[in-house]
């Protein structure tokens, strides 16, 4: 596989299927930096200032849990990331000079200005997990305002096949995550532009060769009380054409694309482009 992709397209040629695919997370990798971080931080600050209600929502009453997680992330930055200086509740990202204090606004809003990860707080209530706070600056065609306060089944309702493949497993799987063993997974999509802030889908007329490979690296960390989960999302957008630097990866990903059923193609906004993408990979 080309070394360009941070998280490359699947190379196993297996048919696409919905799965959680959880893996144990090394605490040293809870937060990811990367060459795109500085540019992302500029976008994040601007969007927090101009579209706050779009990118931040909360249910009142969960501030303490959010602050506890924010402080844990702050300590993690201090321990594992030399580009940060931490003093009390203040965090400075040295390359940009951005400084925030977790107590001067909602802690997720503050933290989101110095890391690339979006942050969602889930609370276990009424035998399910509910989204009670979130900073989602780079949504992939979904709107935080529509999801806040809902449980995980309602949040994932639009995903084709979710009810049969994942709904029976989600709550139990989340319940089994232990505070001592956080987990991570990844997700992918193909987009017509490199824009990461895409709360709604807007069609663009682009050449197939100009599509973008979008990945989400997601983590789940349970609180010591077992009542809360912090869900983080690290978004990246990279030129899809990089895949052609690896002949095996190209041919195997064709099989994955060909396995997508009409409902999933429509959900991923690839119904019109799938044939062109496959031909692009084959030629």
What does each model-found stretch correspond to?
Residues 1-283:
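Extended, well-ordered protein cores
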């Amino acid at each position: 596989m080309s070394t360009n992709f941070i998280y490359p397209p699947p190379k196993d040629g297996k048919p696409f299927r919905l799965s959680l695919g959880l893996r144990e997370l090394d605490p040293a990798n809870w937060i990811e930096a990367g060459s795109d971080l500085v540019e992302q931080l500029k976008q994040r600050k601007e969007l927090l200032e101009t579209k706050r209600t779009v990118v931040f929502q909360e249910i009142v009453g969960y501030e303490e849990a959010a602050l506890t997680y924010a402080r844990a992330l702050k300590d993690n930055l201090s321990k594992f990331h030399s580009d940060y200086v931490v003093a009390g509740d203040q965090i400075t990202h040295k390359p940009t000079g951005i400084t925030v204090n977790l107590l001067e606004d909602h802690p997720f809003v503050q933290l989101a200005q110095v890391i690339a990860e979006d942050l969602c707080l889930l609370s276990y209530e009424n035998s399910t997990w509910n989204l009670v706070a979130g900073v989602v600056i780079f949504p992939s065609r979904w709107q935080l305002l529509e999801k806040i306060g809902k449980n995980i089944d309602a949040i994932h309702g639009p995903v084709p096949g979710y009810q049969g493949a994942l709904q029976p497993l989600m709550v139990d799987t989340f319940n089994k995550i232990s505070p001592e063993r956080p987990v991570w997974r990844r997700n992918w999509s193909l987009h017509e532009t490199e824009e990461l802030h895409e709360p709604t889908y807007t069609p663009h007329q682009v050449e197939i060769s100009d599509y973008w490979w979008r990945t989400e690296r997601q983590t789940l960390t349970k609180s010591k009380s077992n009542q809360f989960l912090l869900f983080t999302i690290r978004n990246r957008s990279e030129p899809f054409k990089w895949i052609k630097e690896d002949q095996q990866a190209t041919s195997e990903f064709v099989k994955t694309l060909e396995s997508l059923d009409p409902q999933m193609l429509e959900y991923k906004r690839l119904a019109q482009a799938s044939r062109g993408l496959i031909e692009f990979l084959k030629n």
